């Protein structure tokens, strides 16, 4: 689905979920959805990820991975606006092990404090490979939302 399609039908779906008793909904995209910021109980991974990163590293040098090269400039700007020195690289979420190793090596050349996998589709396996290759902590976008959701429902 395109973001446009999601936005056009999403408000109705969110209301349906609320009416059916759902307390917490995770938006499965690390993009921004300003149209829905007022929905109570909707977790936006872009927000949870940003907050988690800020809590772990108030300032410093980070590498942000985005799926497509054309997304890197916007991603870099977003994280720079949060006060970070940013290296922005692309890596497809379905990258092979070899591609993930190369990405980790590329990131590792930048004397980083933290790496962010800024797409819901990145996996724990990719996170592990990049962490081992680059030698710095890695935060997975989906993990930030799931950990927050658990706090809200437990």
Model region roles, listed by residue range:
Residues 1-154:
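Non-catalytic structural scaffold of enzyme domains
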